[in-house]
């Protein structure tokens, strides 16, 4: 898996500064929380469609339909230009995809906040809170949602 991620990110047509450490952290959180391998693999691959040349068909072939479906659900629609609209559409997409996609989304936000050294943008914090609130409203609280809630308490609304 690490070789696939490194190859994908080394040959990507993607944003600068995105390395394999973040996807690995996103995969480790659900693994450590006892989630099934499909969720762990989707965590490892959650950004690969946005950030690399990897296609949904390639994901389906290499990792199966369940992983491909989850990764697609976690991929934002870059055709939506406005940040708020794009993130709202992503939140709906994740909620509609089911609790496994929600777990990976929580892990993604948690891993980002775990590695941050300074206050994230207000709109990013607002997106994380809206994601957390939507997931808890639909699927209830979990260890990952509680962890993200604690992380977000470091940055009160401004």
Range-by-range predicted roles:
Residues 1-158:
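Active-site helical microenvironments for divalent-metal-assisted chemistry
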